[in-house]
Amino acid sequence: MAAATALCDAAAPRMASKKRIALISTGGTIEKTYDELQGVLDNRTSVLDVMLASLQLQGIEIVRIPLMNKDSLQMTPQDHDLIARTAGSMAEAHDGVVIVHGTDRLARSGERVCELLGSPRVPIVLTGAMRPYVMRNTDALQNLTEALLAVQVMPAGVYVAMHNQVLQFPGIVKDKDRGTFVRAGG
């Protein structure tokens, strides 16, 4: 009887521990909301918690790091350094890092992460949106979902995940004509 119990215990599925994913928010189009008084889209309040609440996220624990809430066109070299350093420190304590970022300067931050960190020990995935989450035809939720999946399955490195593709830095640029990211020269 003890042998049968031991076999059953050995065959029982083990509860896998949840992957801890750091989610660094920096603002950008993905997080813009409509300011009715001013009649403009602006980075005032993050919508990431609303987006995350709409997803089935079994198997991962999201640790939110609200770093800044800027349009990426307003980012300085110091902002890109701060993003890279924060990603590096989060990579030491988590199974992966997702950086939500404005698309106009996303490639610059991705390159800076590569320069500062070299080869990170976990995947670091940048994502954003061409259209805000609050708009009907947004790509925000798709891109966030893709980044959360990519950070779990890609090997260690720095990536952008958007529009049904995952591209590894360095050498990634925004193609404004196609409205997505591509490999430089591609």
Question: Which residues make up each language-model segment?
Answer:
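Compositionally biased low-complexity segments, especially N-terminal hydrophobic helices
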Residues: 1-5
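Active-site histidine-anchored catalytic micro-motif
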Residues: 7-10, 14-186
